[in-house]
Regions:
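Aromatic-lined carbohydrate-binding/catalytic grooves of carbohydrate-active enzymes
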Residues: 247-393
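Catalytic and substrate-binding clefts that recognize carbohydrates or anionic sugar/phosphate headgroups
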Residues: 26-28, 36, 66-250, 260-261, ...
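A low-complexity, Ser/Thr/Gly/Pro-enriched, surface-exposed linker/loop concept
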Residues: 1-16, 20, 36-81
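Domain-wide signal for the mature, well-folded portions of proteins, strongly enriched
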Residues: 57-62, 85-88, 257
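Long, low-complexity, charge-dense
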Residues: 23
Length: 393
């Protein structure tokens, strides 16, 4: 990520404003940096090149992620401002808004290299927003979700963009699961960075330049949380409190699950289940892929190949199996299909920005996709599972 002709950077500091738990820095060219104390160990950094911040909203954060802090003090120095919690020191340069972060023992945990900068993208009508940081000698990096690479991500570049990549090989990227959170570990300590941006994002862990780690996005904001901790486990715990903890999984979900693409009939499913029991292979669940459906229509059964799903599920239950049936949120465009008709009439499907319904190719062919943004669509969708639950799923 070398410097490009149309890359832009913050100018020298113009003014500073205090807003409760946030300090806002304004540069002469309109760039803004908001530093927020989320907890004593967690700071949020939010940048804008537009002279204002868009409405603050995130799907990722837990409702109670702001769990309080003892204090957040600001002190002006000759060339910097120092922002302090009991556990962190954040130093902001007046020259460039670059940031350095220190632990409670004064050890340097993380610091900007170029810091925040952006590239104008006339094709998308938005900015490519970027952040580059110094990479310490011997620093290790972990995280990001599904990455078919080394555990330590140093010397690699990745992108996060959910992609259907069955049968992938080593170093294939991007893949299915994308989590814009990574750990940094070096001799001075450890930390985590959560990049809260829903655009296509990229992470370069000292790949292009050996002493620099960068992350950037094709739109939105540089909006990240810096999480300090005495250990990686400690950082993980604070990250979990920030974004929310999942429900405790049932014990059976931790066992062996039999899954493949795909079982074509009820008879085949029962043959597999019987064989697993005959061979005494401990198995807690068996999966039904798309072939159980009628023409790949969600929330339906193929009555020819799965003539009695309720009896099948109950028999599997007697044998000690949980039944897990796939549901893809791609709804076949067919007004004789009740899910499509209902979603269409209630205006629950995704649309293009200029109004027409979005159509995408999924297993049945052309499909509509539910717009899960409104709560009423999520409630409708969850209610569609009732018939399957009644069948014993």
């Amino acid at each position: 990520m070398q410097t490009l002709v149309n890359e832009h950077f913050p100018d020298r500091l113009l003014k500073v404003e205090e807003h409760g738990s946030s300090i806002i820095f304004h540069a002469h060219n309109g760039v803004m940096l908001a530093v927020e104390a989320v907890t004593n160990h967690v700071l949020r950094f939010r940048y804008s090149a537009k002279g204002y911040f868009s409405p603050d909203f995130s799907y990722a954060m837990a409702d109670d992620h702001r769990s309080g802090f003892s204090y957040f003090k600001i002190e002006e120095k000759d060339d910097t401002y120092e922002l302090k919690t009991p556990k962190l020191l954040c130093v902001v340069s007046k020259d460039s808004l670059k940031v350095s972060l220190y632990g409670e023992d004064g050890n340097l945990l993380n610091e900007d290299e170029k810091g925040f900068h952006w590239e104008e993208d006339s094709q998308r009508g938005d900015n490519i927003v970027k952040m580059s940081k110094r990479s310490f000698n011997g620093e290790h990096y972990f995280g990001l979700g599904d990455k078919a690479s080394n555990l330590n991500m140093r010397d690699h570049r990745f992108q996060n963009w959910g992609t259907d990549e069955y049968g992938f090989a080593k170093d294939r990227d991007p893949l299915y699961r994308n989590i814009p959170f990574y750990y940094g570990l070096h001799k001075e300590g450890c930390y985590g960075i959560f990049f809260d941006n829903t655009y296509r994002t990229f992470f370069d862990f000292a790949k292009e330049r050996k002493n620099v780690t960068s992350f950037w996005a094709e739109g939105g904001e540089i909006n990240y949380y810096f999480i300090a901790g005495s250990s990686l486990m400690n950082v993980a715990q604070r990250y979990a409190r920030l974004t929310g903890k999942p429900e405790m999984p049932p014990k059976w979900s931790l066992g062996y699950h039999q899954c493949k693409w795909s079982y074509s009939s009820e008879q085949e499913v029962m043959e597999i289940a019987t064989k697993l029991r005959d061979l005494k292979i401990p198995t807690d669940a068996i999966y039904l892929d798309i072939d159980y459906m009628d023409g790949f229509r969600c929330f339906t059964w193929n009555n020819e190949t799965f003539p009695d799903p309720k009896a099948m599920v109950n028999k599997l239950k007697e044998m000690g199996f949980k039944t897990v049936a796939i549901i893809d949120p791609g709804i076949k465009i067919d007004m004789d299909y009740w899910v499509c008709k209902e979603g269409f009439e209630k205006d629950f499907f995704c649309k293009h920005a200029d109004g027409p319904l979005y159509k995408g190719k999924v297993w049945p062919g052309d499909c509509y996709c539910p717009d899960f943004t409104p709560a009423k669509v999520r409630e409708w969708w969850s209610g569609l599972f009732n018939a399957g639950i009644d069948d014993g799923e």
